[in-house]
C-alpha cells in the first residue's frame, strides 16, 4: 500500500536513529531533502550534526522559528515495524522522527507559498543528551537568524490524533541527571568486618533519597528523584569495593531543584561518614523548565481552536524534561503536545505513533504560520 510523501520520510528517518551529536546520517537526509526544494529564497547552514534553514519572507518584519529535535535513544526496538531501526540498540522511541518530518513538511509548505516574515527551522541534535538547544542557541550560525518567536512540539501518546494540548506558563519541569559514585573497601564475603560494603551503602542511599521528596519539598510543589540504575560488585562472594547510582531529579520550581540538590549532598555526606567511604556526585546535564509565553500561547490556542480542525486541550504541567526550555528563556514562544494515540508511551521499545498525526500537524501549523507571518 502506497503511503504519503511525509509518512515515507518519517519511516526513512525511523530506520536511522542516532544518539546526541552523532546524527550524521540524519543530518545528511535532511540536507538531501532540502536540496530537492532548490529555491532561491532558501538558505542553509550546518551546525555540528544539526541543520539551520532560513526561508526568506517577501516583506519581513520578524523571524518565526520552528525547532525539531532529531536524535534517537539507546533503546532496542520492539515495534515489529517493517521499517524498524537498522541501527542495533538505537530507536526513535521519543518521536523525534515525527518532529523532524513535520518540520520538513512545514518547510516545504513555506517554500511553496512564501509568507511576509522570515521563517527559520532549527533541526537540533542531542535533545536526549547531552543537550543541543543551548549551544545551538549560542552559536554563530544562528546569531544573524535568531527568531523573534519560536515554537516546538512533542508527540503525546496519551492524546488522540487530531488534538493538541498545552497551557500558558509552566509546561515542563526542570530536570537534572544524577550520578553518585561510592568507593569503599572490598573483601571476602566470609570476612565482612574487614571490608566496607558499597552495595549496602548504595542501598541505604537509595532509600534515604526518597525522604527528600516527602520531607524537604513543599507538598504544594512537585519533585521526583528516580534512581534508574545501580551497578556494583563483580561476583557473589566478593564484597563490592565500588558502586554507582544513576538517576534523575525533576522539579517544577527552580527553588525546589536547589533545595533537592542541597539535601542530596547532605545525605551523601552522611553515607560517607556512616560507611567510611568516598563519594562523588555528578549532576551531568541539566535542562531548564519549559515556560510558555502567556500571550503567544493564548493566541495560538485560540487560533487553533477557532480556525483549524484540531481540538485544543488545556493540560497540566508535566515532569518531563526538554532542553527547548533554554530557547524559551531567550525567545518568546511555546511548546505543545501533539496527540499520536499510541498504546505504549515515550521511551518505550514498542512506541508506535499513529502516522495520521503527521499530515494533520503539517496542515494546521502551516495555517498558523501563514496567519502569524503575513501582514494583515
From Swiss-Prot:
InterPro entries: AcetylDAP_deacetylase (IPR023905), Amidohydrolase (IPR017439), Bact_exopeptidase_dim_dom (IPR036264), Peptidase_M20 (IPR002933), Peptidase_M20_dimer (IPR011650). GO terms for molecular function: N-acetyldiaminopimelate deacetylase activity. The active site is at 69, 128 (proton acceptor). CDD domains: M20_Acy1_YkuR-like. It comes from Bacillus cereus (strain AH820). This is N-acetyldiaminopimelate deacetylase. Pathway: Amino-acid biosynthesis; L-lysine biosynthesis via DAP pathway; LL-2,6-diaminopimelate from (S)-tetrahydrodipicolinate (acetylase route): step 3/3. Catalyzes the conversion of N-acetyl-diaminopimelate to diaminopimelate and acetate.
Amino acid at each position: 500500500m502506497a503511503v504519503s510523501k511525509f509518512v515515507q520520510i518519517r519511516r526513512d528517518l525511523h530506520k536511522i536513529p542516532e544518539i546526541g551529536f552523532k546524527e550524521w546520517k540524519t543530518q545528511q537526509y535532511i540536507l538531501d531533502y532540502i536540496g530537492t526544494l532548490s529555491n532561491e529564497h532558501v538558505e542553509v547552514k550546518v551546525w555540528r550534526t544539526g541543520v539551520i534553514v532560513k526561508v526568506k519572507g517577501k516583506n519581513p518584519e520578524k523571524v518565526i522559528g520552528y525547532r525539531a529535535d532529531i536524535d534517537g535513544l539507546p533503546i532496542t526496538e520492539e515495534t515489529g515495524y517493517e521499517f524498524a531501526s537498522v541501527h542495533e540498540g538505537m530507536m526513535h522511541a521519543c518521536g523525534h522522527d515525527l518532529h523532524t518530518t513535520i518540520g520538513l513538511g512545514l518547510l516545504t509548505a513555506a517554500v511553496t507559498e512564501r509568507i511576509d516574515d522570515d521563517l527559520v527551522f532549527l533541526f537540533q541534535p542531542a535533545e536526549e543528551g547531552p543537550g543541543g538547544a543551548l549551544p545551538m542557541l549560542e552559536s554563530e550560525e544562528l546569531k544573524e537568524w535568531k527568531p523573534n518567536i519560536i515554537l516546538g512540539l512533542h508527540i503525546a501518546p496519551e492524546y488522540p490524533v487530531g488534538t493538541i494540548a498545552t497551557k500558558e506558563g509552566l509546561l515542563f519541569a526542570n530536570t537534572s541527571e544524577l550520578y553518585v559514585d561510592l568507593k569503599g573497601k572490598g573483601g571476602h564475603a566470609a570476612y565482612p568486618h574487614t571490608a566496607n560494603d558499597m552495595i549496602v551503602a548504595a542501598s541505604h542511599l537509595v532509600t534515604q533519597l526518597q525522604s527528600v521528596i516527602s520531607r524537604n519539598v513543599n507538598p504544594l510543589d512537585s519533585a521526583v528523584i528516580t534512581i534508574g540504575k545501580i551497578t556494583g560488585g563483580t561476583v557473589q562472594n566478593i564484597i563490592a569495593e565500588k558502586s554507582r547510582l544513576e538517576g534523575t531529579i525533576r522539579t517544577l520550581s527552580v527553588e525546589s531543584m536547589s533545595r533537592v540538590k542541597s539535601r542530596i549532598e547532605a545525605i551523601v555526606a552522611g553515607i560517607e561518614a556512616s560507611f567510611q567511604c568516598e563519594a562523588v556526585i555528578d549532576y551531568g546535564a541539566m535542562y531548564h523548565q519549559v515556560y510558555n509565553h502567556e500571550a503567544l500561547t493564548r493566541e495560538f490556542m485560540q487560533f487553533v481552536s477557532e480556525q483549524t480542525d484540531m481540538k485544543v486541550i488545556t493540560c497540566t504541567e508535566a515532569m518531563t524534561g526538554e532542553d527547548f526550555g533554554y530557547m524559551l528563556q531567550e525567545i518568546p514562544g511555546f511548546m505543545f503536545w501533539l496527540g499520536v494515540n499510541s498504546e505504549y508511551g515515550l521511551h518505550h521499545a514498542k512506541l508506535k505513533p499513529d502516522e495520521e498525526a503527521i499530515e494533520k500537524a503539517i496542515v494546521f501549523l502551516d495555517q498558523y504560520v501563514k496567519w502569524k507571518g503575513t501582514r494583515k
